[in-house]
UniProtKB/Swiss-Prot annotation:
Family under the similarity heading: Belongs to the Smg family.
Gene name tied to this protein: smg
Protein's UniProt name: Protein Smg homolog
Taxonomic lineage: Bacteria, Pseudomonadati, Pseudomonadota, Gammaproteobacteria, Alteromonadales
Database matches in Pfam families: DUF494 (PF04361)
Domain of life according to the entry: Bacteria
HAMAP family for the chain: Smg
Organism: Shewanella piezotolerans (strain WP3 / JCM 13877)
NCBIfam families recorded: PRK03430.1
Length: 157
């Protein structure tokens, strides 16, 4: 499923090619690209879930304290390794992620069918979330810079 999300992001969203909005056409395109039907459905469902997070009624996106500290659940700790959690914290500290977008990222990570996620995969999920979050264009651009113009060495300590 993650491969399909990457394919869609790289070939449509990131390349600024007109995105196919017809789900049947998109499914046919992905099938021609070699993806399996079941994985295509999972990826499209994941994207629909991302779009639904934009709705104002999402409970964990309301009434938050900007000074709060995130405690991860057992399942989140198993899926998101220490390095990735540190990177999320780093992005919050430099204001690339807000409390809301961090929670959206964690929500989308937990909905992937991967048992664990590496830092590079997490970065792509963050890009997808920021791209789809209205009003976060600057954060998206900063994240792009962190990914594509990454200096040698670690980004955070």
């Amino acid at each position: 499923m993650f491969d399909i999300l990457m394919y869609l992001f790289e070939n449509y969203v990131h390349s600024e090619v007109e995105f196919l909005v017809d789900e049947d056409e998109l499914t046919k395109e992905l099938t021609r690209a070699g993806f399996h039907q079941a994985e295509i459905i999972k990826a499209l469902t994941w994207l629909e879930g991302l779009a639904e997070l934009q709705e104002a009624g999402t409970p964990y996106l309301c009434n938050h304290d900007q000074q709060s500290f995130r405690i991860y659940t057992k399942d989140e700790l198993e899926r998101i390794d220490v390095e990735s959690r540190g990177f999320l914290l780093f992005l919050e500290q430099i204001k690339v992620l807000s409390v809301e977008t961090r929670e959206m990222v964690i929500d989308r990570v937990m909905q992937l069918d991967e048992s664990s996620l590496n830092l590079d995969d997490l970065k792509w999920v963050i890009l997808m979330v920021l791209f789809n979050a209205p009003g976060h264009e600057s954060a998206y651009e900063q994240m792009e810079d962190l990914i594509f113009e990454q200096p040698d060495g670690r980004l955070h300590s």
